[in-house]
């Protein structure tokens, strides 16, 4: 049940072409001081059929434009959902559907997240995630539904032809691990 005034603080969930992946916009209450916006609300997630849980929050700071991180996921039983947002700079954020029973298996969705647009991307369990920074000094915040389990950490290569992800800028910095994932074979 909403309280009076809650309407000005909604999170607006936009469906994407991938089931369970949502682009999230915040509704701002602005005045002379600046603004107020709700960035997390369990009821808002539940109203979209999502079961929110925050087990861990992470921050990724990226010195240079063209830094690519990903494309990562955790294998069962440690699969994770995440909400990704940019708190400084901007990035091109990618969700890749790796759920074999999904109608969008091996398809991807991308969205530009920035400190200016304050959008977020919800990525469900079974989808991989990666991003490319579009500005120097880009900071990314993640709310994760599961703790990090190194033994369950997996990834697919950012330029694997099995997916055809189109990145909007040159990849200049990438870890050896992310660069060396083998060609994808069905899960």
Which residues does each predicted region cover?
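Conserved metal-binding segment of the jelly-roll/cupin
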Residues: 113-136
